[in-house]
């Protein structure tokens, strides 16, 4: 776990404390399994109040970075065992070298999940599935609009399919989903390719042809895979800013 950028960028005291602790954990200054320094020592070192530090520690504990032990020192967790997908955006900020792999994993997960729950959605309620494309004709040809439409479309299919767990996964990935979506959809060719996918999927929903869902998704993923490969090979260093 390494990061060449040791300069803290946070502005507020709480953000500064969080960035310092998270970077220190990632760089093994505070290794997994070790204990953090006392609140007093850590607050003095960072330059924040103990109240601010305590709030930050509680938030990091909820995210899986730490385990707060009442009456005992706060323990540093192994994030790969204790954290959830909501920290992905933080991991990308900490280690841009690992970002392509993490994002590729996320895209693969989305593809596999969507094959399952979109099939269920179209099978159980083709009318509600079709309604998700109501705004497609008015979709503006911009990266921002395509990114938002894409996120909402895939997320709302989880609602129609009655898959609340998948919906929570989308919620936790929203930040990084939007960042990489803007990278993908800034190219007109990518928007045109995706628009064709939307139209094909809309027709499938209109016909209630659930059996065609998986093939449609896989064909789109295959068509777009070359574009994604190029994007992941030249990710901007300021992706997390």
UniProtKB/Swiss-Prot annotation:
Task: State the protein's purpose.
Answer: Multifunctional regulator of fatty acid metabolism.
* Family matches, as InterPro entries: FA-response_TF_FadR, FadR_C, TF_FadR/GntR_C, Tscrpt_reg_HTH_GntR, WH-like_DNA-bd_sf, WH_DNA-bd_sf
GO molecular function terms here? DNA binding; DNA-binding transcription factor activity; fatty-acyl-CoA binding
Task: List the top taxonomic levels of the source.
Answer: Bacteria, Pseudomonadati, Pseudomonadota, Gammaproteobacteria, Pasteurellales
Which Pfam families does the record cross-reference, listed alphabetically? FadR_C, GntR
Ordered alphabetically, the record's keywords are: Activator, Cytoplasm, DNA-binding, Fatty acid metabolism, Lipid metabolism, Repressor, Transcription, Transcription regulation
Description of how the protein assembles with itself and partners: Homodimer.
> Could you tell me where this protein is found in the cell?
Cytoplasm
GO biological process: one example: fatty acid metabolic process
Q: Which residues cross the membrane?
A: none
Quote the SMART domains the UniProt record gives.
HTH_GNTR
What's any one GO cellular component for it?
A: cytoplasm
Q: What is this protein called?
A: Fatty acid metabolism regulator protein
Matching PROSITE patterns, A to Z?
HTH_GNTR
Domain HTH gntR-type residue range list: 11-79
Transcription regulation among the record's keywords? Answer: yes
Q: Which residues bind DNA?
A: 39-58
